[in-house]
């Protein structure tokens, strides 16, 4: 069978390898990967499976070997750490198969990425919009990396940093810290996870002000919080943004009061988890307006009615909304 599984094996812990990847490894006649990663998957291979390992920066060679073996009729599994589509082998294999006009079937099997593992260990730091930036300038010019870092800092994204430091790249992380301090509070939480999911794992938190880049190496993932992120019992929490205790400088006092009111109402509802999000949104407004929690039992909305009305308004298809409210 002319097939290549492109498998993300997770950050390193056996329990983070998905069942689908287990199955692909068992089926493979040939497994291709960076030599360091084979220690994490050896036990899942069938007897007689051929392992082809290469060193760092030999991605094209790995891809070529995998394609050639698959074209010869073997089932091949190419492994990447984390998720194969995030700084992994998936894009390269698609590119090279396209260049060759190869008829090999490619199937990408997702894996737990290092930033996801790090986030879980740090609490809940990626509860809102986020971006991932690699600080390695091996394939991307530093000028572009810096421009992206500035954009992320200005836009208040939670930001995960990969490849923050190496022997030759020792100043880039400090530069990114400087850029973020121009747009974020010095007290912004920063989480660091070293060797995520591996025996030498280390997890700690700090702030942008106190971040010591000397503690970081190439196996460290950093997660920088946004303006709403906070530390709680040693964990980083980034609220989803719907109900916030603190408003930004631009937020009006009335909006902050409403946000706090909604948080309180939500905590007092009997069954908040059982309502569709658009119905819950309308219910919060109804209770907030009337101060009557019986609205939880009285309010009715057609399925998806609120979201459809909202979308129609955003799209400009609905220009008039008629309301009939009787206040007693």
Residues of each region from the PLM?
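Short, basic, glycine/proline-bearing loop/turn elements
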Residues: 1-9, 49-53, 129-135, 285-297
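Short, polar loop motifs at secondary-structure junctions
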Residues: 35-39, 226-228, 325-328
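A contiguous loop/helix-start segment that scaffolds small-molecule binding in enzyme catalytic cores
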Residues: 4-6, 75-76, 154-251
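Glycine-rich phosphate/diphosphate-binding loops that line cofactor/substrate pockets in enzymes
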Residues: 66-73, 150-155, 305-318
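Class I SAM-dependent methyltransferase SAM-binding "motif I" and its flanking Rossmann-like core
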Residues: 86-155
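General beta-strand structural signal in soluble alpha/beta enzymes
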Residues: 32-34, 53, 78-80, 106-111, ...
């Amino acid at each position: 069978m002319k097939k290549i599984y492109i498998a993300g094996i997770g950050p390193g812990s056996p329990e983070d390898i998905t069942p689908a990847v287990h199955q692909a490894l068992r089926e493979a006649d040939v497994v291709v990967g960076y030599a360091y990663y084979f220690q994490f998957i050896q036990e899942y291979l069938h007897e007689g499976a051929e392992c082809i390992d290469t060193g760092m920066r030999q991605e094209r060679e790995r891809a070529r070997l995998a394609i050639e073996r698959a074209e010869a009729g073997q089932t091949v599994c190419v492994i990447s750490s984390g998720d194969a589509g995030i700084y992994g082998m998936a894009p390269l294999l698609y590119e090279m198969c396209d260049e060759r006009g190869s008829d090999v079937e490619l199937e990408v099997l997702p894996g737990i990425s290092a930033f996801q593992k790090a986030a879980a260990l740090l609490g809940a730091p990626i509860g809102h919009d986020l971006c991932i930036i690699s600080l390695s300038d091996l394939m991307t010019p530093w000028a572009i990396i810096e421009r992206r870092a500035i954009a992320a800092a200005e836009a208040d994204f939670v930001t995960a940093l990969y490849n923050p430091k190496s022997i030759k790249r020792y100043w880039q992380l400090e530069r990114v810290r400087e850029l973020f301090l121009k747009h974020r509070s010095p007290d912004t939480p920063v989480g660091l996870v070293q060797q995520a999911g591996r025996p030498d794992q280390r997890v700690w938190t700090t702030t942008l002000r106190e971040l010591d880049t000397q503690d970081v190496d190439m196996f460290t993932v950093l997660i920088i919080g946004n303006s709403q992120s906070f530390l709680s019992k040693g964990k980083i929490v980034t609220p989803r943004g719907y109900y916030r205790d603190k408003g930004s400088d631009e937020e009006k006092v009335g909006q902050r009061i409403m946000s706090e009111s909604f948080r309180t109402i939500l905590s007092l509802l009997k069954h908040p988890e059982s309502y569709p999000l658009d119905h819950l949104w309308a219910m919060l407004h109804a209770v907030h307006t009337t101060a009557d929690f019986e609205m939880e039992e009285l309010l009715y909305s057609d399925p998806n009615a609120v979201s459809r009305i909202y979308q129609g308004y955003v799209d400009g298809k609905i220009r008039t909304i008629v309301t009939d409210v009787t206040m007693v």
